[in-house]
């Protein structure tokens, strides 16, 4: 052996060194690990390979180059129906470059900028190579155009791909633009990242009763379903929506083929803990009499929910066969079952049971509901891929129809030219519509989503970047969280901890929410655990869901504007400006983005009932006085109800029936709908119902299932039954179903538990009439009135012939029932002798709701008098008579419309013509038996509200019914961290083979004992159990070594869970992962040499991955690893090292200097305000014509930078100024964060911005060949100011100053656009009407640009860009980068400002009280760093967890002759004397926010008033004033300003002179008292008109207010 190779001990030179300490010093075994210098260089290297937006682009490229070809390959062949020998085969597909065809049919290259300006779609043609047969010959065609696809900017097919900055500039693009979005019809659209709950994974959580339950969301291409296993009374049950009740798991396992109890026990676990836990479930199986698989399937078949089939369509399968199919294909449908071999599914279900038992004994076995390893992210490529597959299959089906039609004609078949049959608009329109609307309605994939794409925010460069990295969680299964901003440890390094919403979207606390039981409550009265109605935004189907995280907070905490939205019928809601509403096109839209005349979805329902404090929260009788309406003894005493029926009613909690039972509301509705009741010869009760439509009967069945009658026994009316049993062919059957929809349906319930229950309940007299629950009465009334056979509901519309007005009258004709005898059934159906079915008692019930009616006993008519018509219409809400409900809804909204417009119109009452009523008929649509109305917005006003409230729902649909509006509840918005990456799907096959090669035993070959042995670890691949392994460490270590060696993909995750004894291998897409440095034996594999190679360009980030120096970890594998924060923190057990600490933040939070010194909410606030800061958006900002652009005139690079600013190149497009700030108190105008600003600084351009707004019109070509025209102004026109901007061509001149109402384009449209016109060019000018485009904004602006171009439809497009320059004024909002915003409180001349000994005057003075409560220490350090940077000529760095240290900054300040603490000697500008203390003085980067006084200020001296109250209108848009509210009034009272109160609340509002009687206190008329019949004691007084109106309305309610007059 070479002695030198042995080591230092054999070296003779070493022996002279002396001690062992020197030995260790030389060997460096005990040295600290030196940190690698400039390790942060790995971050820009990663950004080049992956980047923030690159995952969007890579995802789209993967679709274009790989997925698209796979989809075509899977659907390559079409065969004709008429001739099977004729086929079409798609052999290849490719996407070209973006092009457009002009008028001259030339194809020109499209650029993104051209599409933005011309409102075109930036798309490229899709070409396919095809083969098809013609005359028995195979014809090949190449590059056949089948449609266009929008191209993502900077993707491989984009013209910007691989372009240099110079080439980008030549194309009119900004080199800094990130790409990753689409341009559709001129709008920039981005497909957001969507967060979903990971499918096919078991989740163990606590249910509402505090017991563990397991749930799995199974997802395959065929079906999506949710399966649960719950624990009740120590027994385990399977829960699935196909079964009407929870099924004992032992019966399910038997149905799947597990024959013995011993085998079940072995599958779950042989330990005593598991045996004891499963024994009650096995015993229950025996009690149910289930011993074999056949018995189990029969049991399951009898519990299958009743799903409506068309009448006459019989199910050919038996109940047991149907149950077997449900177990195989619906329950846990992601687990494959081949030839009814349930072995895999049995093991999977056993694992769910085992984990529930473990969780019941040890709470640590519960899954964290927000654990991010259970989430998946969908990228644009995946969503576009689904969209293309759907469009391509539609295209193929249309092509197949065309081919079949062509082949059917012999003369055409021989000369068939297939390319001529191809329609290119199917795919083109499919893409364009989906991306522009954001709706992904793909029925073949059971996918219906809205809001998938959104308009890209261009408020600032960073707002664009922030939106590209946003994660939309609208469609996820939201989990319970401690609070809306709770952080999960699993999000570390994956999601930004700071960039969460500044505040949730919220509502006014008095907003009425519709509960799942039909009640309506103010949101302030809700509490966690309450159930509300939520709606699927696509199908409008109603679901019940619990709420949590309910809160009521001060609105001042959020700093958001509150909006009041009013519709054309007067429906109102107050919400924050980011609260989302469902619009008529199916999209969610924030309230601040709503416009007048936008249409919103509303749920039409009767007005909510008043809640008083005497009732409990459910508005039932007082809990202290609980009464039994029906109990077991009453039924036994009746002697007609079988014991079996009594037991069944007790099991579904309808016996005893108490007056506080929530089901009473549904019961009253069902009782009110009864048509006839009686009994047969066996004395069995017969309950008969009659419905107009099948859908009405479906609603009735849903109510029965809610009560617990899962499979109610009923039969059709005899006549209908005979019709249904006729044997008819398919077409006749369809026709019969259509006819059946038009006939009434009569249903009999004979001798069932439901029948006995109803009969017994009717024997208890007057319980509805005496009930204190108003909803019980209301639902009974609504159903009774809508009864098809008992009440004839007449809506009489009376038309005034003079003015064509419509008036309505309600007439209820009570039909007398007669006893009927049915000989065939040998039963008597008679009317039940009960007071409820009585027209007099109906009137009594109506009177309780202040609905006044009269009775005509001769005709049995009950007439609702006119004064109560609206109350009656608002009261009833019909569920089982859809046809009648539609009519009532139309009248209700019509009356609301009249009432609202009369109350808000200055003139006399408006006349609503009969044609206007037709408007409401058109607005109503019906979806899944829910009444939806679409209403236009009439007003959008800003409001003040001291409190706001909201909550989160547990369901998939985060929607609610609030004041009738379909709105969204609060949720989280998350953003990617800097180095997070989203995986794409990878093939499972190679990993499966590798797992078996590494010793995994096939799960199908394993017994129950082996499955749960101590050494056996279950191996799961993407959630599927594939086998077990007895050496888990070997398996995991080997797989990881192979990944680091590049033998398997770098994004494969391997995770060992010791508690559950599982090894999870994942290669599915959508997992968040991030790169970390591998550590071996306490030494990072990354060395300084590697960094030097990276700096020299010899290595890339991907090289480090391939060499096994860095690897990607997802959230699950992170849990199985130990990560060190820095090199100094490495321990013997450390496996990985972080690349850089600051990468835990996102791109927006990374701009904050020294964020680790700030209070956490401040960083969150800055993330929101940073996106609202005005700055530069792109290099091409002055050539764009966007809807709204804010530009800062002189942007500056911040003196205190961060690494993230360099990485994003934000310093090239900044948003703010370096303001010299003095932290001191100066006058009283700087309290509450207000700023004192230097007038000279504003004169020099500080905070000055440009607002650019677009106005567009087009010259349309109409169907009769006529078109719009632009007329030059006539000499008479030019005398009017509104025509003053027009040039000789009828278009306004650039550079002119436009005022509101002035004409910009003098456009005229033809009067006749329908009838054919022989010579459109010869139409006289008199045949045109003016349709000019005028300047529509309140603030004047200059015409900056005028663009004349044409779009996709080749129509002339005229765009005008309006420019206004704004300098800061009082009330404008500014913010630092630390979440401290403040308005400009006062602007002071420079000579009055304090100045330092160097003569420097501050630009801004801020109050020092802004620091202690906000705790923004980072802002102080930023001032020091900026000051040192100015003096030293270097930029300071305030990177998170790093940056320049305060000690070093202070040394620089001292070396330059300044105070180490940043304080200066300052002299007062007013007195010229030095201030009494040193002032903290230096530069801080300030942002100007988009919130400016000019956009929001409004006031009025005089203007329109409301007709009803004669008070001024409200809202800026309606010329309204500012309301002096209750709190303002109380403040004035406190100051004793009585004259001001009188002036504000009466003289300037609604002063009204009335005559009042001193004797009786009533109001008189024209100096005469009607009550006293005298004019002696009459006095004239002045009161507000609203007060006089209140007195009169109270008198109408029999409340008599009297005035006591005293001589002044």
Swiss-Prot record:
Maturation and modification: This protein undergoes a protein self splicing that involves a post-translational excision of the intervening region (intein) followed by peptide ligation.
EC supergroup of this enzyme: transferase
One annotated GO biological process: transcription by RNA polymerase I
Record-linked PANTHER family: DNA-DIRECTED RNA POLYMERASE I SUBUNIT 2 (PTHR20856)
Biological source species: Dictyostelium discoideum (Social amoeba)
Keywords in alphabetical order: Autocatalytic cleavage, DNA-directed RNA polymerase, Metal-binding, Nucleotidyltransferase, Nucleus, Protein splicing, Transcription, Transferase, Zinc, Zinc-finger
Binding site for Zn(2+): 1557, 1560, 1569, 1572
NCBIfam families: intein_Cterm (TIGR01443), intein_Nterm (TIGR01445)
Catalysed reaction equations from the record: RNA(n) + a ribonucleoside 5'-triphosphate = RNA(n+1) + diphosphate
Record-given protein name: DNA-directed RNA polymerase III subunit rpc2
InterPro entries in the record: DNA-dir_RNA_pol_su2, DNA-dir_RNAP_su2_dom, DNA-dir_RNAP_su2_hyb_sf, Hint_dom_N, Hint_dom_sf, Intein_C, Intein_N, RNA_pol_bsu_CS
EC number: 2.7.7.6
A Pfam cross-reference name: RNA_pol_Rpb2_1
GO cellular component: mitochondrion; RNA polymerase I complex; RNA polymerase III complex
């Amino acid at each position: 052996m070479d002695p030198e190779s042995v080591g230092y001990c054999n070296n003779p030179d070493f022996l002279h060194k002396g001690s062992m300490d020197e030995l260790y010093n030389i060997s460096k075994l005990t040295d600290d690990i030196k940190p690698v210098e400039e390790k942060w260089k790995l971050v820009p290297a990663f950004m080049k390979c992956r980047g923030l937006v690159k995952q969007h682009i890579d995802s789209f490229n993967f679709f274009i180059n790989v997925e698209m070809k796979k989809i075509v390959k899977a659907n390559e062949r079409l065969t004709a129906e008429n001739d099977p020998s004729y086929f079409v085969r798609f052999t290849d597909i490719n996407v070209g470059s973006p092009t457009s065809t002009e008028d001259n049919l030339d194809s020109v290259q499209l650029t993104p900028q051209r599409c933005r300006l011309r409102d075109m779609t930036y798309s490229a043609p899709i070409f396919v190579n095809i083969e098809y047969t013609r005359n028995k010959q195979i014809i090949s065609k190449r590059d056949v155009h089948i449609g266009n696809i929008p191209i993502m900017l900077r993707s491989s097919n984009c013209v910007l791909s691989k372009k240099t900055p110079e080439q980008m500039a030549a194309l009119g693009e900004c080199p800094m633009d990130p790409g990753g979005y689409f341009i559709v019809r001129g709008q920039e659209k981005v497909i957001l990242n969507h967060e979903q709950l990971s499918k096919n994974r078991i989740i163990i959580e606590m249910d509402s009763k505090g017991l563990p339950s397991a749930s799995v969301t199974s997802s395959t291409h065929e079906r999506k379903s949710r399966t649960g296993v719950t624990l009740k009374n120590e027994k385990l049950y399977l829960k699935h929506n196909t079964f009407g009740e929870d099924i004992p798991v032992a019966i399910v396992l038997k149905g799947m083929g597990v024959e013995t109890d011993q085998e079940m026990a072995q599958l779950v676990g042989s330990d005593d803990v598991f045996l004891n836990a499963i024994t009650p479930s096995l015993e229950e199986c025996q009690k149910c009499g289930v011993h074999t698989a056949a018995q189990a399937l029969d049991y399951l078949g009898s519990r299958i929910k009743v799903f409506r089939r068309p009448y006459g369509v019989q199910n050919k399968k038996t109940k047991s066969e149907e149950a077997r199919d449900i177990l195989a294909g619906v329950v846990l449908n992601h687990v494959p079952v081949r030839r009814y071999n349930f072995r895999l599914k049995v093991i999977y279900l056993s694992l769910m049971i085992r984990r529930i038992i473990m969780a019941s004994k040890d709470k640590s076995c519960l899954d964290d509901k927000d654990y991010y390893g259970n989430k998946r992210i969908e990228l644009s490529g995946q969503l576009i891929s689904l969209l293309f597959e759907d469009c391509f299959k539609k295209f193929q089906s249309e092509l197949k129809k065309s081919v079949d039609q062509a082949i059917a004609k012999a003369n055409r078949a021989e000369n068939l030219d297939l390319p001529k049959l191809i329609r290119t608009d199917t795919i083109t329109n499919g893409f364009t519509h989906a991306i522009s609307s954001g709706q992904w309605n793909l029925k073949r994939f059971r996918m219906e989503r809205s809001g998938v794409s959104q308009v890209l925010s261009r408020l600032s460069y960073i707002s664009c970047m922030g939106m590209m990295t946003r994660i939309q969680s609208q469609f996820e299964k939201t989990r319970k969280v401690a609070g809306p901003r709770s952080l999960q440890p699993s999000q570390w390094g994956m999601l930004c901890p700071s960039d969460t919403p500044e505040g949730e979207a919220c509502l006014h606390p008095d907003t009425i929410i519709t509960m799942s039981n039909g009640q309506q409550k103010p949101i302030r009265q809700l509490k966690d655990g309450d159930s509300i109605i939520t709606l699927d935004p696509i199908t409008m189907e109603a679901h019940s869901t619990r709420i949590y995280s309910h809160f009521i907070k001060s609105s001042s905490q959020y700093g958001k504007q509150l909006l009041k939205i009013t519709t054309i019928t007067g429906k109102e809601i107050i919400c924050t400006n980011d609260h989302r509403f469902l619009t008529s096109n199916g999209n969610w839209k924030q309230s601040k983005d709503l416009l007048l005349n936008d249409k919103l979805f509303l749920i039409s329902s009767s007005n909510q009932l008043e809640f008083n404090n005497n009732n409990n929260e459910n508005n039932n009788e007082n809990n202290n006085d609980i009464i039994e309406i029906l109990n077991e003894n009453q039924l036994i005493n009746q002697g007609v109800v079988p014991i079996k029926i009594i037991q069944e009613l007790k099991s579904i909690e309808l016996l005893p029936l108490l007056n506080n039972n929530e089901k009473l509301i549904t019961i009253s509705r069902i009782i009110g709908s009864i048509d006839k009741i009686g009994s047969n010869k066996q004395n069995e009760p017969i309950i008969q119902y009659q419905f107009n439509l099948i859908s009405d009967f479906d609603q009735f069945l849903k109510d029965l299932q809610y009560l617990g009658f899962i499979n109610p026994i009923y039969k059709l009316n005899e006549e209908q039954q005979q019709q249904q049993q006729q044997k008819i062919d398919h077409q006749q059957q369809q026709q019969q179903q259509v006819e059946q929809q038009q006939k009434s349906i009569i249903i009999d319930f004979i001798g069932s538990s439901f029948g006995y229950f109803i009969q017994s309940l009717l024997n208890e007299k007057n319980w509805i009439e005496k009930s204190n629950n108003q909803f019980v009465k209301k639902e009974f009334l609504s159903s009774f009135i809508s009864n098809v056979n008992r009440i004839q509901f007449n809506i009489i519309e009376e038309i005034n012939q003079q003015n064509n007005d419509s008036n309505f009258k309600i007439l209820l004709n009570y039909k007398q029932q007669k006893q009927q005898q049915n000989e065939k059934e040998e039963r008597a159906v008679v009317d039940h002798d009960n007071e409820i079915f009585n027209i007099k008692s109906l009137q009594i019930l109506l009177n309780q709701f202040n609905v006044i009616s009269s009775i005509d006993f001769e005709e049995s008519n009950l007439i609702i008098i006119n004064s109560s018509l609206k109350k009656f219409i608002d009261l009833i809400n019909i569920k089982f008579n859809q046809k009648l409900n539609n009519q009532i809804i139309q009248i209700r909204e019509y009356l609301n419309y009249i009432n609202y417009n009369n109350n808000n119109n200055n003139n006399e009452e408006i006349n609503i013509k009969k044609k206007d009523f037709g408007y409401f008929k058109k607005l109503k649509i019906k979806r899944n038996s829910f009444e939806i109305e679409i209403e236009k917005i009439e007003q959008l006003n800003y409001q003040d509200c001291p409190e706001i409230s909201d909550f989160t729902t547990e369901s998939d649909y985060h929607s609610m019914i609030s004041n009738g509006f379909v709105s969204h509840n609060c949720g989280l918005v998350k953003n990617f961290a800097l180095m997070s990456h989203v995986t794409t799907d990878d093939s499972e096959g190679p990993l499966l083979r590798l797992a078996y090669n590494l010793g995994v035993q096939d799960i199908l070959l394993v017994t129950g004992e082996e499955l749960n042995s101590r050494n056996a670890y279950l191996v799961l691949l993407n959630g599927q159990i594939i086998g077990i392994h007895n050496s888990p460490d070997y398996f995991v270590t080997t797989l990881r070594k192979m990944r680091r060696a590049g033998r398997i993909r770098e994004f494969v995750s391997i995770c060992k869970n010791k508690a559950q004894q599982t090894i999870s291998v994942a290669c599915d897409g959508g997992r968040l992962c991030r790169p970390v440095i591998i550590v071996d034996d306490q030494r990072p594999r990354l060395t300084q040499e590697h960094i030097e190679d990276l700096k020299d360009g010899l290595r890339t980030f991907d090289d480090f991955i391939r060499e096994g120096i860095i690897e990607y970890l997802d959230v699950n594998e992170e849990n199985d690893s130990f990560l060190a924060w820095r090199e100094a923190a490495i321990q013997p057990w450390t496996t990985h090292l972080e690349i850089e600490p600051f990468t835990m933040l996102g791109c927006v939070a990374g701009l904050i200097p020294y964020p680790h010194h700030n209070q956490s909410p401040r960083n969150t606030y800055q993330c929101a305000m940073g996106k609202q800061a005005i700055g530069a958006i792109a290099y091409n900002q002055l050539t764009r014509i966007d809807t709204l652009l804010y530009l800062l005139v002189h942007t500056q690079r911040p003196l205190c930078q961060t690494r993230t600013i360099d990485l994003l190149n934000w310093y090239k497009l900044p948003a703010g100024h370096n303001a010299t700030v003095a932290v001191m108190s100066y006058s009283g105008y700087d309290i509450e964060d207000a700023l004192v600003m230097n007038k000279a600084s504003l004169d020099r351009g500080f905070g000055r911005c440009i607002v650019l707004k677009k106005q567009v019109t087009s010259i349309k070509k109409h169907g009769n060949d006529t078109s719009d025209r632009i007329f030059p102004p006539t000499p008479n026109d030019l005398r009017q100011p509104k025509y003053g901007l027009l040039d000789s061509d009828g278009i306004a001149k650039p550079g002119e100053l436009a005022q509101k109402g002035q004409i910009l384009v003098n456009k005229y449209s033809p009067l006749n656009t329908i009838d054919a016109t022989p010579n459109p060019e010869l139409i006289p000018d008199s045949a045109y009407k003016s349709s000019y485009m005028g300047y529509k904004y309140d603030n004047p602006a200059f015409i900056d640009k005028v663009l004349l171009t044409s779009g996709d439809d080749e129509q002339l497009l005229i765009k005008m860009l309006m420019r206004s320059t704004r300098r800061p004024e009082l009330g404008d909002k500014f913010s630092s980068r630390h979440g401290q915003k403040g308005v400009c409180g006062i602007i002071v001349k420079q000579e009055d400002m304090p100045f330092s000994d160097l003569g420097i005057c501050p630009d801004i003075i801020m109050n020092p009280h802004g620091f202690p409560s906000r705790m923004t220490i980072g802002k102080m350090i930023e001032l020091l760093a900026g000051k040192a940077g100015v003096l030293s000529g270097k930029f300071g760095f305030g990177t998170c967890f790093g940056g320049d240290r305060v000690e070093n900054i202070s040394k620089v300040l001292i070396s330059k002759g300044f105070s180490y603490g940043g304080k200066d000697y300052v002299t007062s500008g007013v007195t010229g004397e030095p201030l009494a203390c040193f002032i903290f003085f230096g530069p801080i980067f300030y942002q100007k926010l988009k919130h400016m006084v000019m956009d929001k200020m409004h006031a009025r001296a005089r203007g329109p008033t409301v007709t009803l109250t004669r008070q001024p209108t409200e809202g800026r848009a309606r010329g309204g004033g500012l309301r002096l509210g209750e709190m303002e009034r109380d403040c004035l009272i406190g100051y004793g300003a009585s004259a001001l109160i009188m002036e504000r609340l009466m003289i300037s509002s609604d002063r009204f002179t009335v005559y009042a009687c001193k004797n009786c206190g009533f109001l008189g008329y024209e100096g005469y008292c009607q009550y006293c019949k005298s004019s002696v004691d009459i006095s004239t007084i002045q009161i507000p008109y609203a007060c006089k109106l209140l007195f009169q309305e109270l008198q109408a309610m029999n409340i008599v207010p009297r005035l006591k007059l005293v001589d002044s």
